[in-house]
């Protein structure tokens, strides 16, 4: 019988913004954001909690953020600095386990099931890691401790900033009952809306539906919903995880009737893609661009082109070519980049979006 796993999710608090406030103390307690210049149609990569009180969030166009908060202090992205801090923190984590799965520069999963550090207590390990990060880097981190990855990630967000939460194995069944379905991995606003139409607001509501019904209603996602609603997630912490692509997509409440409508929403998708790329940090370089369209008959097409940078004109062309394949209203539109896989560990910084 396999031992109950001890999974920790470490999530740095407002990582980029926190580094800016540490390096420039005069910014403390002021609303600040890290991102691109509004004059060049930049987007917010992250912001501190003071800025979030104004409704500012990551992936928001900088121009809109400045309208929400005229006092917002905009800092340029210093990716080399953030990467250096991330590397230091990563090296610290390796003192506790070799089973580390980085998700981005500022978060990672740790499997400490077999660790003998801190008398084998995952709770104490998380506390010690957070304390050492603050003592050595003057940065705060939040942590979630649970028997699996999904619950650990949910827990790390529970007492942010600078807090941690433990979900014990014996408490999982009770914990998930009142958990809003929007907290589940893969449940975005659109899926939450679909579940809400079935009067599913919590995991307890979701548990009332059979696996057969959920599979019929939501396809493969139905299996995932069935398991997550019961606190089940058997995915291992994967140290060899290599990112192959970065993408964003949106399912629209009203179908996009023509290619012009698809092109009209492209700037928003590009802003979100840029923010996601910035969050990923150092990557191995771009191999190609791709566009995905799902039509209102649920048929799907993907079209791509070899490119070493993101180009708005090329994305517009791909959307037009993809739409022409069926010429029907589009219910889902996505854009993304595929990454070079050779020399993965000789990664280079992503060039800025070519607008």
Curated annotation (Swiss-Prot):
Cofactor note as given: Binds 2 magnesium ions per subunit.
Catalytic-site annotation from UniProt: 107
Entry keyword set: Cytoplasm, DNA damage, DNA repair, DNA replication, DNA-binding, DNA-directed DNA polymerase, Magnesium, Metal-binding, Mutator protein, Nucleotidyltransferase, Transferase
Role played: Poorly processive, error-prone DNA polymerase involved in untargeted mutagenesis. Copies undamaged DNA at stalled replication forks, which arise in vivo from mismatched or misaligned primer ends. These misaligned primers can be extended by PolIV. Exhibits no 3'-5' exonuclease (proofreading) activity. May be involved in translesional synthesis, in conjunction with the beta clamp from PolIII.
GO cellular component, one term: cytosol
UniProt KW Membrane keyword: no
Gene3D superfamilies: 3.30.70.270, 3.40.1170.60, 5' to 3' exonuclease, C-terminal subdomain, DNA polymerase, Y-family, little finger domain
Cofactor field: Mg(2+)
Subunit annotation: Monomer.
Protein name: DNA polymerase IV
Enzyme nomenclature, EC number: 2.7.7.7
